[in-house]
């Protein structure tokens, strides 16, 4: 048995969906532990492109339990839409489970998210506008609605009175938005509750029953390390904890239950929305990476900002998450480049530093110091073994492993499942018996 956490080692969009899908074949339970519909992952199965925001990638395996955990925030309308999409594609969803204690994104959360972002003007933080921050804020203020509240008209009405009154006041007086009607919300969300009822479970009990039976449990994070509320580029962050420690809180398990932590990183770096990005590219190479990599957000459709691989934030992700190994994705996107830069340090106020500064103001001043490596100028898309890779591509991967001081377990060379080199099974293989030198 091995219980594994999969996290993003950059600013999200690293390709966690594909890696989770790959590892789900060996998992009995897949748990999404934080975030909401602000995340998105794309999975390709038999030429079908499936875009999911809430439901874990493991849903594609009929014998796998897929649990949306207590640490998530759930937009039930989106979840029901995803369920229908999966059913329309003849995918068995009997293993889909939803924590009764997960918090619910309400209509006023979405309205406030968009209104607040608009009011920030040039101070905007790049929110997806899906109501995630306001939902987590209500959770912290103990004003939130939970999935279990959708099971009872009386309970929902009782729980909704105070927050809706407060939010209607804000919407009207500050943002000039018409107030929401409580009876309409109650009817809508009770209906969502009826549709989701068969999936609702006790999250903690479900996970610990599986653990007692020595089942393999895969914990799936959304977003990435540098978007973590406490450890990311604050305030340009999400409202939860995507780092590996967030799995314990969001799923309700102790750290001793976790056996391994796998970090997913692109062979280059991307970022969506606002915030500093030291290795960001502009011009033709940026366009090439964006076009070849299909760098448009699953959730927002926004064009992603592209840059060279940043080893400084990579090493930071290794430390913050306690990574055991890495999965490197989209290596094939670099196939046509003559030369490739890797950021090995920063220059800040005339001094060389090799650490991630905690001040976002300092981070904005950081200039990357690059190591230049030769490109391989040939396709890697059909490589299925390490020895199939061009020597320059192998050298690139070895340099990444050495720079980040953690071995590489998986290399992804395209969106399809079979476009993958598994150097060592991160779930069943021996720890650290991987590509690291």
Swiss-Prot record:
UniProt binding sites for GTP: 12-18, 40-42, 304, 330-332, 412-414
Domain of life from the UniProt record: Bacteria
Key words of the record: Cytoplasm, GTP-binding, Ligase, Magnesium, Metal-binding, Nucleotide-binding, Purine biosynthesis
Residue numbers annotated as active site: 13 (proton acceptor), 41 (proton donor)
Subcellular location field: Cytoplasm
GO molecular function: adenylosuccinate synthase activity; GTP binding; magnesium ion binding
Span of the signal peptide: none
UniProt pathway annotation: Purine metabolism; AMP biosynthesis via de novo pathway; AMP from IMP: step 1/2
One Gene Ontology cellular component: cytoplasm
Documented EC number(s): 6.3.4.4
Cofactor(s) essential for the protein: Mg(2+)
Function comment: Plays an important role in the de novo pathway of purine nucleotide biosynthesis. Catalyzes the first committed step in the biosynthesis of AMP from IMP.
PANTHER family in the record: ADENYLOSUCCINATE SYNTHETASE
Family per record: Belongs to the adenylosuccinate synthetase family.
The protein's name: Adenylosuccinate synthetase
Organism: Prochlorococcus marinus (strain NATL2A)
Lineage, highest ranks first: Bacteria, Bacillati, Cyanobacteriota, Cyanophyceae, Synechococcales
């Amino acid at each position: 048995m091995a219980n594994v956490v999969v996290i993003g080692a950059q600013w999200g969009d690293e390709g966690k969906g594909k890696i989770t899908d790959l590892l789900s074949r060996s998992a009995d339970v897949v748990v999404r532990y934080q975030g909401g519909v602000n995340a998105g992952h794309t999975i390709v199965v038999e030429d079908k492109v499936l875009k999911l925001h809430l439901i874990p990638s493991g849903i594609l395996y009929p014998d796998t339990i897929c649990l949306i955990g207590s640490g998530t925030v759930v937009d039930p309308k989106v979840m029901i839409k995803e369920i229908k999409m999966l059913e329309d594609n003849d995918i068995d969803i009997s293993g889909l489970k939803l924590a009764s204690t997960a918090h619910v994104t309400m209509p006023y959360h979405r309205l406030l998210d968009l209104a607040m972002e608009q009011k920030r003007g040039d101070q905007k933080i790049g929110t997806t506008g899906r109501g995630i921050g306001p939902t987590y804020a209500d959770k912290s203020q103990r004003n939130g609605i939970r999935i279990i509240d959708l099971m009872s008209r009386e309970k929902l009405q009782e729980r909704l009175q105070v927050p809706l009154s407060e939010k209607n006041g804000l919407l009207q007086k500050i943002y000039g938005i018409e107030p929401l009607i409580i009876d309409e919300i109650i009817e809508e969300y009770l209906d969502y509750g009826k549709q989701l009822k068969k999936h609702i479970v006790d999250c903690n009990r479900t996970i610990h029953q599986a653990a007692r039976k020595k089942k393999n449990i895969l914990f799936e994070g959304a977003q990435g390390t540098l978007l973590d509320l406490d450890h990311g580029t604050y305030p340009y962050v999400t409202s939860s904890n995507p780092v590996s420690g967030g799995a314990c809180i969001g799923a309700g398990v102790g750290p001793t239950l976790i056996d391994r932590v796998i970090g997913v990183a692109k062979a280059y770096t991307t970022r969506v929305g606002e915030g500093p990005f030291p290795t960001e590219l502009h011009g033709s190479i940026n366009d090439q990476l964006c076009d070849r990599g299909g760098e448009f957000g699953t959730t927002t459709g926004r064009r992603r900002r592209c840059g060279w691989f940043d080893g400084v934030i990579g090493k930071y992700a290794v430390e913050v998450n306690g990574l055991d190994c890495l999965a490197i994705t989209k290596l094939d996107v670099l196939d046509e480049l003559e030369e490739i830069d890797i950021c090995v340090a920063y220059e800040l106020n005339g001094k060389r530093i090799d650490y991630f500064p905690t001040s976002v103001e300092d981070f904005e001043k950081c200039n990357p110091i690059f190591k230049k490596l030769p490109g391989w100028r040939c396709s890697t898309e059909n490589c299925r073994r390490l020895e199939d890779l061009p020597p320059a591509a192998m050298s690139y991967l070895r340099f990444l492993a050495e720079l980040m001081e953690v071995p590489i377990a998986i290399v992804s060379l395209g969106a399809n499942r079979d476009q993958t080199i598994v150097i060592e099974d991160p779930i069943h293989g021996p720890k650290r018996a991987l590509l690291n030198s």
